[in-house]
Curated annotation (Swiss-Prot):
Region Disordered, annotated ranges: 107-127
Residue ranges, compositional bias (Basic and acidic residues): 110-121
InterPro entries named among the record's database cross-references: Tail_Gp41-like
Source species: Haemophilus influenzae (strain ATCC 51907 / DSM 11121 / KW20 / Rd)
Name of the protein this chain belongs to: Mu-like prophage FluMu protein gp41
């Protein structure tokens, strides 16, 4: 899945504008979760791991970027931070709409599976 940025990331003197997105893997999810954890001290002096939901989201997003033009992904957090607000919002909205579309397909398949069980008909060719 591809989208175009307004400002993009610089590669030498050339702005890279075309973003290619990819499916997240289980490894991506685990790596993002670990990257979003920080060791903090409680007032009692105990060390605990704290997870930042916002950081987790950005870690997932940067891993979902397969490339930005000539720049291979996943992009670094530094590169993600260097995006303009508009470009970051564009990527975020695109990723959210892509995930929503995939979720709707799963729900639709579930409806077909349920209809298949109720009618005894093979509806797999419909999807």
């Amino acid at each position: 899945m591809k989208l175009m940025l307004e400002t993009g990331l610089m590669f030498g003197e050339e702005a890279q504008l075309e973003v290619t997105m990819r499916e997240l893997t289980t490894g991506d999810l685990l790596d993002a979760e670990m990257a979003a954890e920080r060791l903090v001290m409680t007032p009692e002096g105990e060390a605990v791991l704290a997870k930042s939901p916002a950081l987790f989201g950005y870690e997932l997003l940067r891993r979902q970027i397969a490339s930005v033009g000539k720049i291979n992904g996943p992009i670094s957090m530094r590169q993600l931070r260097s995006l303009t607000t508009e470009d970051l919002n564009r990527i975020s909205l695109y990723a959210q709409s892509w995930e929503s579309a995939k979720a709707e397909q799963v729900v639709s398949r579930g409806r077909l599976d349920t209809a298949d069980q109720e009618t005894g008909k093979d509806l797999s060719a419909v999807s």
